[in-house]
Amino acid sequence: KTAQKITQEIHLICQSPTKQNGTVLLRNRELSILEHADGYVMLFPTLKNIFEAHMTKDGHLVQIYCSSAVTESNLENLFHAIRPFFLFIAQKNGKFAVHSASLLYKEKAWLFSGHSGMGKSTHTNLWKELFGTPLLNGDLNLIGEENGQFFVYGIPWCGTSGICTTEKQRLGGIVLLGRDAKDNRFEIMTPAERVLRVMQRMISPSWTDELV
């Protein structure tokens, strides 16, 4: 039986919000998340035209309070503000985001993941230069399972790479990059190591025990 998809509506409200208090779940330079009885409140300190955003507990309704001024900068900020809500509802539908660069090789998507600065984009760009492999996304990839097979779904968020696609491709595998000054090698990890390393690279929401 196919699970029913959970949908999401995003409303833009061009006025100041009614400030809501709540329990702080996350706070960093770019995002603060508070929880209250009816849902979540999100604040985006670096996105000056985004006043505040509210989301129901199940993610079906999002209200973004923002400036009515239409500028290239404001639209870019709005695009970035929508991402956590999209990733929340994607996770509710069994799809998870992995910080990685991806390419298409032999009709399958291959992801290269590692810490920032590890060389994900350098690696995929070398594949393109040497073998002509198309690049799919330069920063973030959404993975899900359908009928026992894993797929990578195209999304528009791609960091500063400018590389993204709307295509859906079968997942070939995930290469987890490391660094060793003395040697270049491949290692086959144990199942437990694979799960742990991939989870460390996930961008999907993990604000509460339920989301983890």
Where are the regions a protein language model picked out?
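A noncatalytic interaction/capping subdomain that flanks phosphate/NTP-handling catalytic cores
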Residues: 1-116, 126-136, 141-212
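Conserved glycine(s) of the Walker
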Residues: 118-120
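Hydrophobic positions on the alpha1 helix immediately C-terminal to the Walker A/P-loop
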Residues: 123
